[in-house]
């Protein structure tokens, strides 16, 4: 769904583990990384869209996670002009997102990025909480910063101890 201003209604998903780390996914066949996200279909609530996208992109279900928080406001970013599909009707100039902070309540072996008909991601890893703000593609950076800032006080209680060692890429 695209609103009257040209923004596609969308959900963004931050999954936290008990160490205060967040799930960071590698886009299929690319070198870019991001949080799971996806569009809201006609007649769908943001929460319903979040659970659908969570299953399609990460293979997790409602019983695998707990909703800790939802962003107070819709957060928007504009697409760079080179990514806008000007021949589409209506034209989508960016994303308008409702963000969800989830706590992983299952073993990470439940993560399976092959459940959807077309995989969005081909790898993932746990990263420190603020890492995505610095690493995401530049046009999404402000939205990530705002969502992460809003969720920070709620995500940090999950953190038990700082984990030593390097981040490990996982295939899923």
From Swiss-Prot:
Record bears the keyword Endoplasmic reticulum: no
NCBIfam families hit by this protein: PRK00714.1-1, PRK00714.1-3, PRK00714.1-4, PRK00714.1-5
Protein's name according to its UniProt entry: RNA pyrophosphohydrolase
Purpose of the protein: Accelerates the degradation of transcripts by removing pyrophosphate from the 5'-end of triphosphorylated RNA, leading to a more labile monophosphorylated state that can stimulate subsequent ribonuclease cleavage.
Cofactor: a divalent metal cation
Species the sequence originates in: Vibrio atlanticus (strain LGP32) (Vibrio splendidus (strain Mel32))
Motif (Nudix box): 38-59
Superkingdom classification of source: Bacteria
Lineage of source species: Bacteria, Pseudomonadati, Pseudomonadota, Gammaproteobacteria, Vibrionales
Gene: rppH
GO MF, one example: mRNA 5'-diphosphatase activity
Pfam family, one: NUDIX
UniProt-listed InterPro entries: Nudix_hydrolase, NUDIX_hydrolase-like_dom_sf, NUDIX_hydrolase_CS, NUDIX_hydrolase_dom, RppH
GO CC terms of this entry: cytoplasm
Record keywords, A-Z: Hydrolase
Gene Ontology terms describing biological process: mRNA catabolic process
Its EC number(s): 3.6.1.-
Disulfide bonds: none
Keyword Coiled coil (UniProt): no
Domain Nudix hydrolase span(s) in chain numbering: 6-149
Family: Belongs to the Nudix hydrolase family. RppH subfamily.
